[in-house]
Swiss-Prot record:
Protein name: 3-methyl-2-oxobutanoate hydroxymethyltransferase 1
One annotated Gene Ontology cellular component of this protein: cytoplasm
Organism (species): Bradyrhizobium diazoefficiens (strain JCM 10833 / BCRC 13528 / IAM 13628 / NBRC 14792 / USDA 110)
Entry's localization field: Cytoplasm
EC nos: 2.1.2.11
Record flagged with keyword Metal-binding: yes
One GO-annotated biological process of the protein: pantothenate biosynthetic process
Cofactor: Mg(2+)
CDD domains in UniProt: KPHMT-like
Annotated function: Catalyzes the reversible reaction in which hydroxymethyl group from 5,10-methylenetetrahydrofolate is transferred onto alpha-ketoisovalerate to form ketopantoate.
Length: 326
């Protein structure tokens, strides 16, 4: 029986990515900061991200908060000139989506006016209303949870997120709220592999991993790290391919193959995950139970069978209550 090959695609679109997610196809995403680097990997890349990580790998900043809207527009305009086949997504920089809804929409809309197909926005909680406002203006949004580099000063450094029960449940809740706000994809950075797998399995949108284990729909390759390893980049956020290959393009293609078979950064996740926490996380394709009243909490506690289960229900109720305060 002959096998019909998939027709080549002239331009990657969001509906196409979502269809590939449903088909179980592995996707590949890389960064692009200028017109020279952007087209090099393009024939085999699905998403090209003009990331604020350019502040680290191109401009020498220690973190991403110094990156401005003007800097992002500069890098985006350069990448657009290469006419990439991949879906082009641009990062909303620090303070570009914090001040007001109007300013947030203007900054995100500016990306589309310059040729991007979507904007990426970090955080959950209070940022979800901003996501809804942007999407209501017909601007596609990619979410980002876990280790969010723009909040590095609050986190006290580049630290793994989601090892504690309240952190993991809040991340799972935020992931579903972002999906409900119509994000077309979600980045999970610096989260334990088992938590990443639970989140990915419970969502219908594609998930994109950065140092979060192998179970996302796709993995991110920072293109510049195939040439060098800047000291400011977290070691878990890209595959260990630099020493294995002398040719820069061989490095990139090796990283691409690792992403395609879900081995970035490694099949064995470097990020630990407490077994007790794994037992308390919900599984399956349904969002975690959200308890919104004391009466509902009491009814649910009466049906629970163990002290651990009751403790987990109380934590979820606390997180649900905090979500309404944010």
């Amino acid at each position: 029986m002959s096998r019909v090959s998939e027709q080549p695609v002239d331009r990657i679109t969001i509906p196409l990515l979502q269809r590939w997610k449903q088909d179980g196809r592995r996707l590949v995403m890389t960064t692009a900061y200028d017109a020279v680097a952007a087209p090099i990997p393009d024939p085999s890349i699905d998403i090209s991200l003009v990331g604020d990580s350019g502040g680290n790998v191109c401009l020498g900043f220690e973190n991403t908060p110094p990156v401005s809207v003007a800097m992002m527009n500069h890098h985006l305009e350069a990448a657009v000139r290469s006419k990439p086949r991949a879906l082009l997504v641009a990062d909303m920089s620090f303070l570009s989506f914090h001040v007001s809804v109007e300013e947030t929409i203007r900054n995100a809309g500016g990306f589309l006016q310059r040729g991007a197909a979507a904007a990426r926005l970090e955080g959950g909680g209070k940022r979800i209303e901003m996501v809804r406002a942007i999407v209501d203006c017909e601007i596609p949004v990619m979410g980002h949870l876990g280790l969010v580099p723009q909040s590095v000063n609050v986190m006290g450094g580049f630290k793994v997120q989601g090892r504690k029960v309240d952190e993991a449940l809040r991340l799972l809740d935020d992931a579903h709220r972002l999906q409900e706000a119509s994000c077309f994809a979600l980045v999970l950075e610096g989260t334990p592999a088992e938590l990443t797998a639970r989140v990915s399995d419970s969502l219908t949108i594609p998930t994109i991993g950065i140092g979060s284990g192998p179970d996302c729909s796709e993995q991110v390759l920072c293109f510049m790290t195939c040439w060098a390893k800047p000291k400011v980049i977290a070691p878990n956020s890209f595959p260990p391919i630099r020493k294995a290959f002398s040719s820069s393009m061989m490095r990139f293609r090796a990283g691409q193959r690792m992403s395609a078979v879900a081995r970035s950064p490694a099949r064995k996740s470097p990020i630990g995950f407490p077994k007790a926490l794994g037992r308390q996380l919900p599984t399956g394709r349904h969002p975690p139970q959200i308890i919104t009243s004391v009466a509902e909490l009491r009814r649910t506690l009466a049906k629970s069978r163990s002290a651990n289960q009751r403790a987990g229900l109380c934590r979820r109720w606390a997180i649900s209550t905090m979500a309404t305060w944010r």
